[in-house]
């Protein structure tokens, strides 16, 4: 999937906001796979990223893309009787593109 929201960090102490435009970026499958529980996947704002990435990723369009990817991967894992960590990412990407999800390698970046 593809994320594209600005980096938008709000200072907890009220000192201001940091805003930075970023080009569209790919969302790696690994952020949705639990490192501790074999059959657990995470999506939306629960994925494993640092606070800077979360400041861009936290918006609903990006959360929906993560959900589409995690849901498709979960279906593939169940169908093949494998764990989420064992899903073939190339096959997942192909299925997502077939389903209409943009691949960041195919997006022209305007700055």
Question: Which residues does each PLM region occupy?
Answer:
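Mobile, glycine/GP-rich and aromatic-enriched active-site lid/loop segments adjacent to catalytic centers
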Residues: 1-42, 47-53
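Ubiquitous "structural anchor" signal
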Residues: 9-11, 52, 75, 79, ...
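Short, conserved micro-motifs enriched in small and acidic residues
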Residues: 57-65
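Internal hydrophobic alpha-helix adjacent to the cofactor/substrate pocket in enzyme cavities
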Residues: 64-83
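Non-catalytic terminal regions with compositionally biased, polar/charged low complexity
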Residues: 78-111
């Amino acid at each position: 999937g593809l994320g594209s929201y600005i980096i938008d960090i709000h200072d907890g102490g009220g000192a201001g906001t940091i805003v930075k435009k970023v080009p569209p970026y790919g969302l790696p499958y690994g952020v949705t796979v639990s490192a501790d529980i074999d059959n657990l996947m995470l999506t939306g704002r629960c994925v494993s990223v640092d606070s800077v990435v979360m400041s861009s990723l936290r918006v609903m369009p990006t959360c929906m893309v993560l959900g589409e990817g995690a849901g498709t991967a979960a279906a593939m894992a169940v169908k093949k009787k494998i764990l989420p960590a064992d899903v073939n990412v190339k096959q997942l990407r192909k299925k997502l593109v077939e389903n209409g999800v943009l691949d960041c390698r195919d997006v022209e970046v305007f700055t």
